Swiss-Prot record:
It comes from Rhodococcus jostii (strain RHA1). The gene is gltX. One of its GO terms (biological process) is glutamyl-tRNA aminoacylation. Residues 111-134 are annotated as: Disordered. The lineage of its organism: Bacteria, Bacillati, Actinomycetota, Actinomycetes, Mycobacteriales. Belongs to the class-I aminoacyl-tRNA synthetase family. Glutamate--tRNA ligase type 1 subfamily. This is Glutamate--tRNA ligase. Pfam families: Anticodon_2, tRNA-synt_1c. Catalyzes the attachment of glutamate to tRNA(Glu) in a two-step reaction: glutamate is first activated by ATP to form Glu-AMP and then transferred to the acceptor end of tRNA(Glu). ATP binds at residue 259.
Amino acid sequence: MTTSEVRVRFCPSPTGTPHVGLVRTALFNWAFARHNGGSFVFRIEDTDAARDSEESYQAILDALRWLGLNWDEGPEVGGPYEPYRQSQRRDLHLDVVAKLLAAGEAYESFSTPEEVEERHKAAGRDPKLGYDNFDRDLTPDQRQAFLDEGRKPVVRLRMPDHDLTWDDLVRGETTFKAGTVPDFALTRGNGIPLYTLVNPVDDALMKITHVLRGEDLLSSTPRQLALYEAMQRIGVADFTPRFGHLPFVMGQGNKKLSKRDPESNLFIHRDRGFVPEGLLNYLALLGWGISDDHDVFSLDEMVAAFDISKVNSNPARFDQKKADAINAEHIRLLEPADFAARLRAFLTLHGHLGETVDESVFATAAELVQTRIVVLSDAWDLLKFLFVDEADFAIDPAAAAKNLGADSAPVLDAALASLDAVEAWDAASLEEALKTALVDELGLKPRKAFAPVRVAVTGSHISPPLYESMELLGRDVSLSRLRSARAGVAG
């Protein structure tokens, strides 16, 4: 390797919705680049016209922006190796194909899959072994005969006759024995370059020094090593990058996490109200960690500590409960004003709040729930009693059945009488009045004393602290709701 600058790339295909495995790959590449003072290159592999979509491309951009994984080169940023969309680089790829053919590193192959199978059968081999290198040494006359038949050749790389070994940054020394990987196709029969060619060619032309990717791509590495050897001989590549293969992310049971699993969908987590810091922290733990007793950390802490050699090669299991717990910790770590702003934006985006809200009331209310939620979507059930139109306020039937029975009548009567006399409508005064009336004078235990008041005022048996909630709600609305609840109670 002849370059001292670390250059890594994240090169997703724009198909479907971004999933957590993809994001983990982006995160580890980003952290590796930042830790080493290198460059994080974002490249789009959009060469599958049947599956690629502009919607998916925009979703990937949206995901990276939301997570704060900024790229140094790539779409919308530019850089010295433009363009960064693979579909716009075909002339570069075809030029490399031509050079490989001219140098004898690659050759045209005319065999059909059926012919390959028949040759295997005739030789007593498994017919599913794959390509048998038959076309390696066709004579010019044989080639011309196939062309005269109208056959369209694919171009194949001539694999070397030596073992292909690399020191994997995650798995250690890995070897594919000579002869285990057949000559592989670089183009389709119509001449269009395949992923097997374009991915390493773009890495070589963009001077990528380290390739960190999922373990599912491990089997493609010997092909890419062979292609790099050939590209160095023809002057296209200056060096072969280091490879590291990240462990599988598993779902429930012993299955690999699938795109069909809801927890794999990045935007489902965002819509539930994960904060980027929480999700990135949890994804970092899928194969890596700072230490056993340091599960919660910031992105800056991750960058400072990140060591690719410490990534565990064993499969990592996605645990939604652990992810939620990590997110809850990050919510608690936010400055109150930052948390309030994020929660306000989230509840507005999801249609719970309008554009006009008493921001002072909201900021105070947000601080009351910051330590009580796991994801941002949890907050609305706790706060909606403060922001719904009074005509839409309703008490949860289950909470009413449990807490607003006939025995709540004297509690509500005493609460109303004591609150009517309160002069300063603040949490301390409300607490003093209600404790005196309900605990001291009625002799009730706190749960029996305050549950009917809480349900009457907030509509639920679960809410932010009662006295602070009533202070925010105000005297008129609080008393009106208590009177309405009392009117619905027999006795």
